[in-house]
């Protein structure tokens, strides 16, 4: 594989999971800076908590401070679900509040992209395109990446639309069902973006707990095609790769797998070696 022309940042989606204590983090039972700890090992983390509630700017300022030891670190962040899943409830005040949350990240040059994630039920239509245009305009000042999960969007015409709007297409790995978005190496807009969700077919649409759909550990063989795609995208764009199979630190294992497969040094939290043994022994 040729040397990538652009930076590749690899990291997990989120950092605050109770099942990561004793697996990713050392047992601590009290105050412990999980974000600052992970920033020693990875150059990006996707912030997922804003999907559920818009954080105040005090939170984003704190997060910027906590990654200060890693000069190469950049966040990506999910957008509030009111803009993508519950649009009938969103207000102009929500737009302002989310911008206020973003500004400390952007002003510190720590914002790689906003992730606009839509569900599989969101399909390509004139109404959907107008909805996207409005959302893109509301957050025109920030780098954006769009994740859609319905195959009706996966075509050259839509890629050209995103490129014209300056928005990245998010390439995803997920369980493949009828009309699912397939694996790809498209690069539109300001950055390349890849999200690996796992392949837990049984729990993807039907699960008692939300973590169940992300309970999946990729084999290194399963990741090989993605290594090629990451390399291809990074020839064109600065690239973000996010592992979202977070249950029991599996996202960290696979992030390290990708680093190693790309010929880069893989830094692994020591606790992870104790839990996964030989699975991360050569990382």
Language-model-derived ranges and their functions:
Residues 1-283:
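Residues lining hydrophobic/aromatic ligand-binding pockets adjacent to catalytic sites
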